[in-house]
């Protein structure tokens, strides 16, 4: 019997765990998934005034731990740490994905006017840099509009998913002239249906895009 593909998910907040678990259950239930949570990273990034370089050693250690635990692939679910993930995956023998790269590739296929909605402000700069980098690699010019809804993050931390979803959907009114809306964080996924209804635009979420890319890389014949 073939051993199931083993995927390590590395989180900086517990709020990302449920959305990615649901995506795996729906899109790739055959995968064997395990979680690594290091929830001091977000606070430490703030304490370092956004200095990602201060966290690179820790991201490298988390990646090594995941690979040493038998992971066939690694997915980070924390959007604010792109440069640290880039450094951590250098030389690693298995695929290591940043949370947004698959979603960004999909968005570039859907159009050039793109809205990026975030609820955690430090996510915006690294995700914007990823968009610009991938667009440059694809020789595409994009018009990227960033929208931050910090009140939604606060609501979700208090367990109020309804208010979280409503605030994000409300903010999407600023994106009705865009080709596609992208959510910057895994924790925002529950707001996708309400946002699509409110805006009338396609909405891409990081979990679904990431699972689809991992499945393509590691189990291409299972579709």
Feature locations, PLM:
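Non-catalytic structural scaffold of enzyme domains
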Residues: 1-223
